[in-house]
């Protein structure tokens, strides 16, 4: 759907909403919108969102944070895929071994770029909140055993899976939390189980 007679800024906001939601699986916060389109005032963003809602391009639930729905995306055909929820991770055992799978979870296929080699881990704790990953979220992970600096990965440390941002530097691996209250984990080596490709959050 094309926005007619809109300011450039409003078009930028709408395009960012679509891009962010397709990439992350959930809508951006108002502050994230501000940063993306170089606006300092959250009230200005709220004004643009209100006008987009009046045009029927988005729907917002004022009682819930981030509860914003893009009508164009909602009207797309939502093919569902089953992704295994991994309840535990054991060293030396394939991540998708039957005994590791706790349940299956269906999500619209447009929440992820592909449906190959995916699994879900339930997020516990607040060590990644500044990356928008909250306690109770379902982290959608693509199985990979390698990572690039800056990737958010699932790493196996002492038989326990942890979600952190990956950096390899000076012969060591730094697993960096996204919460200033937590210290990074520095190790010589670790097993990379996968890379974060999406977050699913129930409101």
Curated annotation (Swiss-Prot):
Similarity annotation: Belongs to the peptidase S24 family.
NCBIfam families found in the cross-reference section: lexA
The protein's role, per its UniProt record: Represses a number of genes involved in the response to DNA damage (SOS response), including recA and lexA. In the presence of single-stranded DNA, RecA interacts with LexA causing an autocatalytic cleavage which disrupts the DNA-binding part of LexA, leading to derepression of the SOS regulon and eventually DNA repair.
Residue range(s) of DNA binding per entry: 30-50
CDD domains in alphabetical order: HTH_ARSR, S24_LexA-like
Gene Ontology molecular function terms on file: DNA binding; serine-type endopeptidase activity
Protein name per the record: LexA repressor
Subunit structure: Homodimer.
UniProt keyword list: Autocatalytic cleavage, DNA damage, DNA repair, DNA replication, DNA-binding, Hydrolase, Repressor, SOS response, Transcription, Transcription regulation
Record's keyword annotation contains DNA repair: yes
Catalytic activity: Hydrolysis of Ala-|-Gly bond in repressor LexA
Residues annotated as the enzyme's active site: 127, 164
Site (Cleavage): 91-92
A GO BP entry: proteolysis
Pfam family, one: LexA_DNA_bind
Entry EC number(s): 3.4.21.88
Bilayer-crossing regions: none
Top-level EC class: hydrolase
Iron among keywords: no
Lineage top rank: taxon: Bacteria
């Amino acid at each position: 759907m094309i926005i007619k007679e809109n300011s450039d800024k409003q078009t930028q906001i709408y395009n960012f909403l679509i891009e962010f939601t397709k990439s992350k699986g959930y809508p951006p916060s108002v502050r994230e919108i501000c940063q993306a389109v170089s606006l300092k005032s959250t009230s200005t963003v709220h004004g643009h969102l209100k006008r987009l809602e009046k045009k029927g391009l988005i729907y917002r639930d004022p009682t819930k944070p981030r509860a914003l729905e893009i009508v164009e995306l909602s009207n797309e055909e939502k093919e569902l895929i089953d992704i295994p929820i991994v309840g535990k991770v054991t060293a030396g055992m394939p991540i998708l071994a039957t005994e590791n799978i706790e349940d299956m979870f269906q999500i619209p296929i447009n929440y992820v770029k592909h449906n190959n080699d995916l699994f879900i881990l339930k997020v516990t704790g607040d060590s990644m909140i500044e990356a928008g990953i909250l306690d109770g979220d379902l982290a959608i992970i693509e199985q990979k055993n390698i990572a690039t600096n800056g990737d958010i990965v699932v790493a196996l440390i002492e038989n326990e899976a942890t979600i952190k941002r990956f950096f390899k530097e000076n012969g060591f691996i730094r697993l960096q939390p996204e919460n200033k209250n937590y210290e990074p984990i520095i190790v010589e080596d670790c097993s990379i189980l996968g890379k974060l490709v999406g977050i699913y959050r129930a409101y």
